[in-house]
Amino acid sequence: MAIERTLSIIKPDAVAKNVIGQIYARFEAAGLKIAAARMIHLSRAEAEQFYAVHKERPFFKDLVDFMISGPVMVQALEGENAVLKNRELMGATDPKKAAPGTIRADFADSIDANAVHGSDAAETAQVEVAFFFPGLNIYSR
């Protein structure tokens, strides 16, 4: 198994609930290491650029509005099968359909305010990690 990196964002709803530490504990318990992390308040332009793949979708404006509504915690996670492992930890996009014990089942309020974002594939992860952590500020351990 290869070591991968993936991007995770703890969204404004979960940051406001003060559950960052509980979510980090789940990453670490699953064998994922936090290789880089920072808290930021996205600008509209940053959110639109990051979610540009969804630009033509009907939910794009609401997604951008939500993502700029408060600070987010962004982290690059590293470990074996990091992309899949993080997606399993997150659970289904709709928290009502998320398996019990997943991050979204435990901390999300709705399909929009669903606590976390995670890269959906290794290729996407590379682009997303580079978006938030350009250069050499990621540290393998």
Curated annotation (Swiss-Prot):
Pfam family, one: NDK
InterPro entries: NDK-like_dom (IPR034907), NDK-like_dom_sf (IPR036850), Nucleoside_diP_kinase (IPR001564)
Active site: 117 (pros-phosphohistidine intermediate)
Broad EC category: transferase
Record flagged with keyword Phosphoprotein: yes
Superkingdom, taxonomy of origin: Bacteria
Cofactors required: Mg(2+)
PROSITE patterns: NDPK_LIKE (PS51374)
Subcellular location: Cytoplasm
Any one GO CC term of the record: cytoplasm
Catalytic activity: a 2'-deoxyribonucleoside 5'-diphosphate + ATP = a 2'-deoxyribonucleoside 5'-triphosphate + ADP; a ribonucleoside 5'-diphosphate + ATP = a ribonucleoside 5'-triphosphate + ADP
Binding site for ATP: 11, 59, 87, 93, 104, 114
A GO biological-process term: UTP biosynthetic process
HAMAP family membership: NDP_kinase
Role according to the record: Major role in the synthesis of nucleoside triphosphates other than ATP. The ATP gamma phosphate is transferred to the NDP beta phosphate via a ping-pong mechanism, using a phosphorylated active-site intermediate.
Record's subunit section: Homotetramer.
Sequence similarity: Belongs to the NDK family.
Protein name from the UniProt record: Nucleoside diphosphate kinase
